[in-house]
Amino acid sequence: MERGQSSNQRNNNNEFILPDNFSELSLKTIENIQRRCRKGLEPGTVRYMRDNRCPGYGWLLPGWLAEERVVASGRVYKHYYDPSGRLYRTQFEVLYAWEKAGLILLDS
């Protein structure tokens, strides 16, 4: 084993699978996420990014992203990111952050 590597080596590939119609604001958020990301991924993990143009994510504000992280076992983890790249683990956390900022989400 080389120096600086752990026995449980992680995949340092932090690339995302993106839809074709991602907005410029969403791409900027991706850059911020990559800048903040320090840990690699478990081998076999795939990351799909969604923005407010994707089905089921129309509730997100422009620049906010949802990540669907599929691990080797097939389990899907959802995470959310604000435009600065900050991670939110649940939709409730996102809505709470918006409420603290004075924003209100109205269901249509």
PLM regions with names:
Residues 1-39:
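Intrinsically disordered, low-complexity regulatory regions of plant transcription factors
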